[in-house]
Amino acid sequence: MRTLLWLGTALLLAAPALQQRSAIEPARRPAFEAALDPLERLRLGNQRFQHGQAAHFNQERDRRLDLARAQHPFALVVGCADSRVPPEIVFDQGLGDLFVVRCAGEALDDLALASIEYAVQELEVRTIVVLGHERCAAVQMALAGGELPGHLRYLGRAIGPHVEEARARLASGSGPIAPELLEAAVVQNVRGVVAEIESSEPLLAELRQRGELRVVGARYDLESGAVEWLPARR
């Protein structure tokens, strides 16, 4: 009798943990979603994430074994290194779904561009998303100006031209950074990085000119979890 009571108590104590585990049990992605346009797959994944309904597709053991042989990501995300904006979680994607290049403020250098070219040339990725986010500290630092210490100066140099364009558009001086200026600079920085990728020669620029490469800008809202897709510049 004591043994039965002990087992019953143990099962009751373990039940919440078991329920939680089953709630996040990974599953294979439905075939219909895998056949969708890459941007639509990202939109659907972000909708699941922001509504607390993440599916955690492609995280199971069989997926890991498949990926040990080869990877075939369906999109590339160039994003900020901010710990609050991990693309795989924000877009509710699994192992091997996204090729990700991250640096503070989405800043590009030769190594970042080489990583992008690798995904495009070797893995045949044809959809690139540049993902910025609201209240980006790297963008704010570039807006503040002044001499930056250590290697931060390289970050300021990469982001600086984009944020200064936003400042010029708003005719804003060098005083305190208003929220609307920071927001405009975040968006302009994304657009600037998109333009850098599109014009990167020879590989990326040639593919885009032939209509074989798509580069899209997006902005992430830290509170709602929603990704806003920026319209293409004409």
Predicted segment positions?
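Short helix-loop-beta junction
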Residues: 90-100
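Short acidic/polar active-site loop segments enriched in Thr and Asp
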Residues: 126
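Positively charged n-region of N-terminal signal peptides that target proteins for export
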Residues: 1-3
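Bacterial N-terminal signal peptides
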Residues: 6-14
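Conserved functional hotspot residues or short segments at active or partner-binding sites
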Residues: 130
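Divalent-metal-activated hydrolytic enzyme cores
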Residues: 20-70, 95-96, 105-123, 137-234
